[in-house]
Structures are given as C-alpha cells and as structure tokens.
Amino acid sequence: MTQRLHALLHSVGLPVPQGLSDAVIESITCDSRCVGPGSVFIGLPGGRVDGGSFWPKALVDGASAVLIGSAAAATLPPEQSDAVLVVPDPVARWAGELAAAFWNHPSERIGLIGVTGTNGKTTTTHLIEHLSSACGRPSALFGTLLNRWPGHSVTATHTTAVADRLQAQLAEAYAAGAQLTAMEVSSHALDQHRVAGCRFSGAVFTNLTQDHLDYHETMASYFEAKARLFAPPLVADQGAQFVVNIDDPWGKHLAERLGDRCWRSSLSEGSAHAELTMSDLVMGSSGVEGRLLSPLGEGSFQSPLLGRFNVMNLLQAVGVLLQQGLPLEALLEAISTFRGVPGRMERVVVDGKGGELPTVLVDYAHTPDGLSSALNACRPFADGKLICVFGCGGDRDRGKRSQMAAIAAELADAVVVTSDNPRTEDPQQILNDVVEGIPSGTALTVMLDRAEAIAGAIKDAGSHDLVLIAGKGHEDYQILGTQKVHFDDREQALKALQDKLIF
C-alpha cells in the first residue's frame, strides 16, 4: 500500500506546507523506532515523554513528514523544516484519521461493531464473532484476549491497539476475507482517540459500574468517555444502529439520548420499553434456555453459558447482528455451539473426578458489579458452601476495594482475600484496604500468596461446595512491582484439585 503525501494530507483536512515534497508514503507510524524512508511519523504526547520531541530523529531516519502537537512544537520549534506539521490537539486523532486514509478506510468496508461497557465486552464480542461466522459471514475479533481473523490469531497486548496499528490490522482482516468485525472498545481507547479513523456501523453498550475512577475521576466522566462510541465522528453515518442495556441506569440514560437509533435490551419483568427481551428462561447447571424476542421476530434458544449476565450478553450480540442483516433463525441455532470465553466462568475439572471434588470456577470479575454478578451466577450451583477467593489490583481505583469486600461477604459463605496484581503498591496494604470492608462475623481467611490462597480454599472445600476464584480470569501472569511473572489461576486450581485427590 502506498499513497502520495499531499493527497493523504488533503484527505483528512490538513494543509500542505509550501515546501513539502509530494513523496510516496509507504507507512504511517506512531513509533519512532519504526520510521524509515517513506514514513509519516506522528509524535503522540505521553504521560512520560512527548513523542513529538523525536521529530529531528524521525527526519534523520528518512521520514517524509512528521506530525506533532503544540506542546512538542513549543519545546522544540521546527521553524526550519517544511516536513514538520504542527497539528491541532489531540494529536492522536490525526494518527487514526491519517492511518485510516492510508489504508483506504478499512472500517467502512468491514462492518465494524464496537462493544463498550464496564463488564461483558469480551464475552459479547466473542459471541458476535462466533455467531456471525456460524451464519456464513467470516468475521474478525479485536479484544482483551486476542486479535484474530481468517488465517490469523495473536494474543492482544491492549484491549484496543494504538490507532496506527489498529487501522493496519483492520486492513489485514479485510484483505483476509473478514466481512464483519467485533471490537472491544475501552473507555481509555475512546478518551485517548485510539479508535479515531474508525467508522462503526453498529455498537453495543453493556453496562457502566465503578471502575477506572483513578483515570476518569467521576462516573459522569467515565460515562461520557463511553458515550463517544455512539456519536460522530465514530459512527459510520445515519444508518448506524445500536443496542443498549436499559436495565443499567447509565444505559437507560444513553438510550434516551440516542432515541430511535437504538434497540433497548432488558431482562426485567414487564419491560414495555425494550425492543430486545427474553421470556420463558430456565437456568440450570448445563446452561440456559428460553425465547428471544426482537423487532424482527422471536424464537427459542439453548446455551451452555452460566449466569444471568451472560443471558444479557447473548441478547445484545443477537440484537446487533440482526441490525446488520443476519437471519434470526440461524443466529438462534448458532447460540448452542458457543462454548464460552477463557477465564469467564470457566470451570476447572479433573477428568472423570467431577463428583468427588468441589466445583471450581475461574472468572475475570474485578469490579464490584462483576463480582456481584459472578457470585449470583454461582449461587444456584453451590449445593454446599459458596467460597470466594479474590483480591484487588494495585495502582488502580482504590474506592472499589471496600465495595468488593462487602459484596463478597454478603454473597459468599466464606471469603478468602489474597493478592491480585499489586503492581507498585504494597501488597499487604492492599489486603488491609480490602479487609476493612468486610464486616465482623464473616468467615474470612487472609492469605497474601495467591497460590497458597487458591490451594487452601480448594483443600478446605467439600465435594458439594463451589469455589469462585475471581479477578484474573484468562491472565497467565501476575504483576509484581513492574515485572510480570507467570501465574495462571486455572493452573493453580487444577494442581490443587489433583493434590486433593492424592492427599
């Protein structure tokens, strides 16, 4: 892929400096280490270093043009270079728009569906990908766990990639034959303009509960960051349609803002204002069955997924795909073949020994609402005690620690508080913060070492008990200080179950 520089700049509304050569552009990058002849380098401001300060090096390395912000220009004025453009803030917006133009606007050709919310993004996007592919429409997936499309799969490093890389990946997915893309869109990605240049033809709002207030400071600010997904310039055009969970108060507020452009989803009894609902729901240890009702018809379904929150994920995934023109009957049939997402209510088992051992589930629940939903989902399957093992991450919203503690104490029969990803905080102080939220009289164990906490909880559990290990889910690492060390809750749980059989 190549483009002429002048046409590229004009296409996104940037002026062309008089002395700027109309070079052939071969790459768009925000990484100064990737600059070479034919590159356009966009210097993004960062928390520690302003990438715009690397403009002299980028020119030395052969960049045809460099885009920087006002702060970098004030620190290191590019007065003698026509190849350096000082663009209006936010600079990240231009990275996305320019990369999208360079790659011929892949999001407008691939049926891009964004999913945002505090909880449920990963399962909902995986559902969208699975259901679409099962209905004969090859799909791509961009999310927390991985990025994949036909012939390609790679572990994701961020929920949403930086704009230049994201546009390149969308182009790769389209070239590989993907006709629809499901993308997790985090509030950080929206606030930092990582999805600039994308045009979404559909979007889903799952819910909004306390998280990331270390970054957004207030719930109102957090909500407005999420709401950007449903407004210009990110929506494709007036034809874009949305699915919004109105059982969530923030979702109800968003639905009122969007009006008839959204289908409202609800599992509440007698919700007369929802276009997407369920009826005749029966939940059991083997999953859920019921009827799905939509503006385009209704039908029965069966799913192996556990928990009421997963029913909402199903409802929203089907709804947004109906809006994209997929047939209801085929979607309902495909639901039964979706087996779930790694680390989301994932059962850890020793083959052939199910009746002798406690039920152990690993889940990513790391917010107050997520933990509440997971524990409520577990309760019907705990014939004995419900035991909750959890911790809270360091260098993150401290306000949710006591809330999660209170929820665990209320909904579980026994609570084991342990370390999560302490990062640069004192792990013991994090535990102290959590324990402060647990009322006296709670069956409480505090154990700093997460492996020992998991092993102890499973060792003490009876065959009719259920152990929920919450917080890390799919993660195969623990962040201690600034280092990642290998750690997988599922591996630790399996070892503990095997040891229980031996001893």
Swiss-Prot record:
Binding site for ATP: G117, T118, N119, G120, K121, T122, T123
GO biological process: cell division; cell wall organization; peptidoglycan biosynthetic process; regulation of cell shape
Subcellular location: Cytoplasm
Positions with a binding annotation for UDP-N-acetyl-alpha-D-muramoyl-L-alanyl-D-glutamate: S32, T159, T160, S186, Q192, R194
InterPro entries: Mur-like_cat_sf, Mur_ligase_C, Mur_ligase_C_dom_sf, Mur_ligase_cen, Mur_ligase_N, MurE/MurF_N, UDP-N-AcMur-Glu-dNH2Pim_ligase
Family classification: Belongs to the MurCDEF family. MurE subfamily.
Free-text function comment from the UniProt entry: Catalyzes the addition of meso-diaminopimelic acid to the nucleotide precursor UDP-N-acetylmuramoyl-L-alanyl-D-glutamate (UMAG) in the biosynthesis of bacterial cell-wall peptidoglycan.
Protein name in UniProt: UDP-N-acetylmuramoyl-L-alanyl-D-glutamate--2,6-diaminopimelate ligase
Organism: Synechococcus sp. (strain CC9311)
Name of the gene this protein is made from: murE
